[in-house]
Amino acid sequence: MNNRGAVTDMISQLPEPLILQILGSLPTKVAITTSVLSKQWQSHWKMMPKLEFDSFLRRLDLENVTKCLLSHKAPVLQTFSLKVRLDRRNNAVDIGCLIGIAMTRNVRKLVLEVYFHRGTFTFPRSLYHCETLETLELILNVVMDVPPSVYLKSLKTLYLLAVDFKDDESVINLLSGCPNLQDLVMRRNSSSNVKTFTIAVPSLQRLAIHNGSGTPQHCGYTINTPSLKYLKLEGSKAFESFMVENVSELIEVNITDVSEIIDEKLRVFLTSVTRLSLALSPSVFTFPTGIIFNQLVYLEICTNKTSWWKLLPLMLHSSPKLQVLKLIDDTDGMNYVEASGEWNQPKNVPECLHHLEKFIWEGYKWKREEIEVAKYILKNTNRLKRAIFSLKGISSEDRLVVVEDLKSVVMATTNSCQFQFI
């Protein structure tokens, strides 16, 4: 027996669940080729819980993918992922057949990335009536025409990335047919047939909406999600038409690169959240005047936005019950552009600093305005328990100076804060 045969024989003695785990760590096309090792190995790949095919990496014949799906014998197909560009060789009918076969294999998660530039794309009816599908990820350069009779009772997670719909009704048809949907992630493309994206899902708990820079400004949103706990809004001025009807359970909000929030109801709901993350530039974003975040205990502000230090005092004064403040800059030192301007400390110390318990600065770069902000906060807190600074962007020679400089501020007060530098 040669060395390859000996290794193959040793692997064959492993428990089948472990063999399937090993095969699952390989690209699907590679795992399938193990069937030539021996007669015993001809069936192992057919029990794999995950099948992934990517024509972007290598030319893919959908006929071969169909044969693989038809040969699959596992009682449940946990994941079926297909990335394909439709052309003369691979057409929409082939995609429809593959989806239909996957549904008969009790697929739990379907990931479909399709690029198609000619007209609408009609999915097989089986996609809209699958009882086992729990996660659906659609990355489509296509137009979806969704029928009114949709029922995906097990679907809990839905990604719609660069997906366009035939009209407003197609959106309503899809979402109304998902009675147990909990997570929805949307990334709108630059050309949209949908004027108002209606999200009326009573079960929805997490919603993320990203508008690209090319998203038409006439595109609006209507949100009615009474169970929603997390909301993320990202992108340009496209949120000018944004209507919130019911988000009474909202706890956490993340807002990134949004110029203005017009809807008064959303402003009201923002005042009831306990966690808020902002990546905004005050020079672009219109801060709502007179708003008080009475329930806010956790605030995160991104420090790589222009004039971010002007937003900070506004939020501190508006958040009287704040307990945790996190400032974050996830850009590396090579991409850092020092903003012009200076920190003007508030005339009156914000009430929240008197009972702030935790101060985190991730990506502290020891810039002038950062030093002023850090010292102001450390100096004016008297209940601060922990201060955590990430100094990865600072040279090892300067770190000791930075540490001593920050600690000296607290030593001059009655604060018994514990420092952590990482």
Swiss-Prot record:
Keywords: Leucine-rich repeat, Repeat. Residues 8-60 form the F-box domain. Pfam families: F-box, FBD, LRR_At5g56370. SUPFAM superfamilies: F-box domain, L domain-like. It comes from the Eukaryota. Gene3D superfamilies: Ribonuclease Inhibitor. LRR repeats lie at residues 132-153, 154-175, 180-201. The keyword Translocase does not apply. PROSITE patterns: FBOX. Transmembrane segments: none annotated. InterPro entries: F-box-like_dom_sf, F-box_AtFBL13-like, F-box_dom, FBD, FBL13/AtMIF1-like, LRR_dom_sf, LRR_FXL15/At3g58940/PEG3-like. Residues 342-391 form the FBD domain. This is Putative FBD-associated F-box protein At1g55030. It comes from Arabidopsis thaliana.
